[in-house]
């Protein structure tokens, strides 16, 4: 598994295009990976997750993948300095039960809501599957509760802080939009990002390693799901 750190040039017209359209950003990220002649999406096949973090001078683009990327296809002047790519295998060996880490995660916390009967009928007539509607969680408490539930599924818990509350802080991040094409039909994309900073304790190393590799939550193609770990803070 590999992690790329890209220092983007915020004056680049190509980056500004990507920043304005989340699907274009996805395409730029995926340009570093081989095309897949299969039914499995290339992002899923290569285990690609990415996150755009604000920095003092603009943005840092982090990209995690199962295979080593080739960033030579990036447009000229997209970066202000050479990319940094490191092998994460040594870090994965530190993932053991009971270990505590500081972490950052940008996610798209939602809850599934059953569609109204009229809406389900309309979807059926259009040949679409009867899927629930996903509603964005907007209050800090509901966002924290969502991550606690994710921890139960993915082998970690959020410890209690000094104030008696979960040691985590959700911050509303930017809402991103874009447009993809399904056949001849354009499809509008809207992703509400929430950034989580805090601490976690691993309870099941196998489940947590899978979560590290594959990400958690929805919106993984669009900047969500990547978990970054660091030594715990005092």
Q: Where is each model-derived feature located?
A:
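RNA-interacting cores
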Residues: 1-234
